[in-house]
């Protein structure tokens, strides 16, 4: 508990007070905790880890003994590096692909198309509910801050066009976006949780969607109540994203990058549960890295079509996506390193 308190104090102090980048704060905290961990705790961790691996059939007695002997010789800094590398291996490709999917959807107009379709389905009298669903769907492949900045101008335009409650729209966007971002992979938080506790990624998706539906329902009713109690006027924005639909792809191609990974990973999960003979392709395509990779290629194709094969734009969009994704990867991996040395 002392090392946990020390590590958390270092992270919070560096991030909140000294405004240090979260990556550096987490690595510094992980290093301090690693060097401060007593040998007794390391032996206990190695014993518990090897026992759990033997119970799962992943280790034999000889390999467990070899692991404990090798682990005792690992230096504190190398343990940090190993945990960091393990975190990258677990989530690196998935986050990179998710970043590319999100960027391609934004640049191609697919994200705006998704919003427009949902609004048309619900009707202008239930725009708040439409924003709730839009935020939830888009925040699965797209990071929450991007979803927020995408939807807010549309909410402003809808408030001016229909005279609707702007605060209701904003709260619905926040409720839908935050719940998907917190509960449904491939967003980094739930993805890392699934990897750390050994939960199948497909099961995490299904469970996150189920819990998310419940929580966003509560969020919607709170938004309805709060929007009647408080008032918020929409700002004037010249960017009306509802008026320009010429660049938008088809409805099917707009939804495909979001739906495809869920279907593929779910198929792989069902294959593992029911042992479907003759359908091994479901297991192959259900690999989370491959599923996100295929979806990223679909999203990239949608962008390619929307920009008529403009190579410079494709290159810039990809570079921007991987730049933003890389930051998330190293922060997530640093968090894995910090969590790993705390467990040790």
Describe the role of every protein-language-model region.
Residues 13-24, 160-168:
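Membrane-helix interface "capping/anchor" motifs
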Residues 1-2, 85-92, 118-133, 161-169, ...:
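Membrane-interfacial loop-to-helix junctions in multi-pass transporters
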Residues 17-22, 88-92, 102-112, 138-152, ...:
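Short helix-coil transition sites and intra-membrane helix breaks within transmembrane domains
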Residues 119-203, 207:
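Hydrophobic transmembrane alpha-helices that form the pore/transport pathway of multi-pass ion
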Residues 1-4, 89-91, 143-147, 209-213, ...:
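Structural signature of hydrophobic alpha-helical transmembrane segments
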Residues 27, 52-112, 136, 285-344:
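Core transmembrane alpha-helical segments of multi-pass membrane transporters/permeases
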Residues 38-79, 161, 191-203, 227-244, ...:
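Inter-helical loop and helix-membrane interface segments of multi-pass membrane transporters/permeases
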Residues 37, 41, 206-317:
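Long, contiguous bundles of hydrophobic transmembrane helices that form the permeation core
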């Amino acid at each position: 508990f002392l090392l946990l308190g020390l590590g958390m104090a270092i992270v919070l102090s560096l991030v909140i007070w000294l405004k240090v980048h979260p990556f550096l704060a987490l690595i510094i905290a992980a290093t301090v905790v690693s060097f401060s961990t007593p040998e007794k705790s390391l032996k206990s961790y190695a014993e518990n880890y090897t026992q759990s691996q033997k119970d799962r059939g992943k280790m034999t007695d000889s390999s467990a003994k070899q692991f404990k002997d090798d682990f005792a010789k690992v230096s504190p800094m190398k343990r940090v590096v190993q945990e960091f590398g393990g975190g990258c291996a677990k989530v690196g490709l998935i986050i990179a692909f998710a970043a590319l999917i999100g960027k391609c959807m934004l640049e191609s107009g697919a994200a705006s198309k998704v919003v427009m379709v949902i609004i048309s389905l619900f009707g202008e009298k239930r725009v708040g509910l439409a924003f709730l669903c839009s935020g939830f769907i888009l925040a699965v492949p797209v990071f929450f801050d991007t979803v927020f900045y995408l939807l807010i101008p549309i909410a402003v335009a809808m408030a001016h066009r229909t005279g609707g409650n702007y605060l209701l729209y904003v709260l619905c966007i926040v409720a839908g976006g935050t719940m998907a971002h917190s509960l449904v992979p491939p967003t980094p938080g739930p993805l890392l949780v699934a990897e750390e506790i050994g939960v199948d990624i497909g099961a995490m998706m299904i469970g996150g969607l189920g819990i998310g539906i419940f929580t966003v329902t509560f969020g919607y009713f709170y938004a309805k109540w709060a929007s009647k109690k408080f008032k918020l006027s929409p700002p004037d924005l010249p960017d009306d994203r509802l008026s320009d639909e010429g660049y938008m792809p088809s409805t099917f191609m707009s939804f495909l990058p979001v739906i495809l990974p869920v279907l593929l990973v779910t198929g792989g999960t069902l294959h593992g549960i029911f042992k479907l003979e003759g359908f091994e392709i479901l297991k192959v395509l259900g690999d989370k890295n491959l599923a996100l990779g295929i979806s990223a290629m679909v999203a990239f194709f949608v962008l390619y079509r929307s920009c008529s094969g403009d190579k410079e734009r494709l290159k810039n969009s990809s570079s921007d996506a991987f730049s933003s994704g890389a930051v998330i990867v190293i922060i997530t991996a640093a968090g894995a390193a910090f969590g790993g040395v705390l467990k040790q």
